[in-house]
């Protein structure tokens, strides 16, 4: 896939900064109250803007600015969880019910945890992981069971918990994938490759890790050729960066040079 130019990447960064400033103005003008919008939605959107900024700087090779923007992104994306579950959160009195605010669902939680893995900051993980959790109804969601298990495993791994627990969680997901065949591309196939990659990390299996990561990247690149091709995340995968960072904790290596993996964040 043709890579974006430096000018295009800088335009994405500038647009995201403009969106942040526009959002701040609307908040001051009472736009949220006028249209009965949740505060969580504004925090989540700002987190996505910083996410795009982080990807842009990473693609341009600017590690300090990429890490700074990724940190801001994670903190804003985590705010809806703090509003829901952290009694000490200053915005808790404005929180919508977790199952109604639309910002802490299963895919969002999965993406946030993988972004935290990409940042690889134990201090931030210790601060936020206790609150980055699913609503009870999502915990019991059988349709998305494989991704729920990904979330549970990542919570343990990022907290530096027991490897045996993470492995057991991932085995449950992988066994489910095998007994319920995956047909074609989509979230189930992507989740399977993530679970297989994380499993290989815990087992310290370098060859399986390489194969699973390559499968993930191949699928990611295929999906990026579609409607996402004009967006920053089509050209850089924080999920892949996060899995590589976790692999390094367990003594595994990544020696590739894939265009979807920005070296500035490794």
Predicted segments, located by residue:
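Eukaryote-skewed repeat-based solenoidal scaffolds used as protein-protein interaction platforms
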Residues: 3-217
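Alpha-helical oligomerization segments
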Residues: 204-266
